[in-house]
Amino acid sequence: MSKHTERIVFFIRQKLQLPALYVRAAALLLLALLLLRHRTAAAAGVVSGIHTCLGTLIPSLFPFILLACLCTNSRAAQVLFRPLSPVMRHVFRLPACAAPAVLLGLTAGYPTGAKITANLYAAGKLTREQAARLLCFCTAPGYAFAAAYTGSLLLRSDRIGLNLFFACALAPLLLGLILSRFAEKPEKSLKSPEAAPGGIVSAVQDGIKATVSLCGFVLVFSMLLAVLHDAGIFQFLCGFLSRFGYTVPLSGALLTMGLEITAGVTQCIYWHLPVYFLAFGLGFSGVCIHLQIFSFFHKAGLPLSKTRYVLARFLNGLLSAAFYLLLSYFLPANTSVAVETSPLNTAPMAGSAASSLALITLSVFFLLTCILRSGKTPSKICGGNSTGKMLQ
């Protein structure tokens, strides 16, 4: 880039900073007015968020967050995952220490994999490029949320829950496999595993801090959703989307899932929307989960391109929906599902198995096109630049 071009870019950035500051100030003022005007709804939203944290989030997530912290501090955990070293090195082109992030991230649920990735980067075991690439395919709802909670408990169908779980696990694996084709194979480490001092104590402390942080984000988004509903802003947005052909239930469910996945799943089931919308939402994971992941990497000192990460999550959501359609075609759900969920289970699908394969192919083609245009650097999609550094 020439000096003249750099001056033009710098001038444009300087001119855009002031309007952006005014927009943020206006948004802060609007938020303050909404909280003062609808303080009762805000309090009710906080209470609802507390019930979600105490009844669902903490019991189901804290054990895996603790396990994630132990996996990065314990020598025994590194030995346990050593058999996966060839797979990580030759298939995903990552060091062996990344195995817990992939395995636990796909099975234990978000944001376990992101937490392990942030810990590995903070410990110097992953480069910036490796951490950025790993982050793109180590985040999934896990078995407890996708299969047990959404499938068995809410939908009362074990088969649908398993299809959701495997769809949300296969999608990030495909992304990781594609991104690894454009990365260099890491050198084989000859060092023996090292254990951090005070592994168990520090793991418990880190697990508690991470869980409290996650609960804080859930409370904030639960409060915001309640305020938006009470102020009529949420209904206005649903009506606006309905002008583009979206039904009001679909608009509300998509908006809710885009913000907070737990409430979004409930909305989808309440309005009896097709299950592939659930698969998309579980694959995308929602802004609440995204902010939780951003907080991990901010503490680890790793700048992250938020726009590119959200784009990767959107592609992951599309692939999850396509994989669910494919799995439900070959492994259809049992017909003996509860009557309450029958409209959801029998809702018309978006297409056949052929259309699902077409959607997967188009998503892969789009991802490959983005990678090739960015100079064959997978971290461009995840948040890094050609030198392995992340973009702000």
What are these regions (language model features)?
Residues 26-41, 46-56, 62-66, 70, ...:
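Selected transmembrane alpha-helices and immediately adjacent juxtamembrane segments
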Residues 35-45, 73-77, 148-152, 226-238, ...:
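Transmembrane helix-loop junctions in multi-pass membrane proteins
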Residues 55, 59-120:
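Membrane helical hairpin/interfacial module
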Residues 55, 60, 64, 68, ...:
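Alpha-helical transmembrane segments in multi-pass membrane proteins
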Residues 65, 118, 135-139, 143-193, ...:
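Alpha-helical transmembrane segments of multi-pass small-molecule/ion transporters
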Residues 76, 204, 208-282:
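Transmembrane helical segments that form the transport core of multi-pass membrane transport proteins
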Residues 91-155, 254-270, 276-301, 309-314:
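Alpha-helical membrane segments and immediately flanking helix-loop junctions
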Residues 126-133, 144-145, 173, 275-370:
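C-terminal transmembrane helix pair
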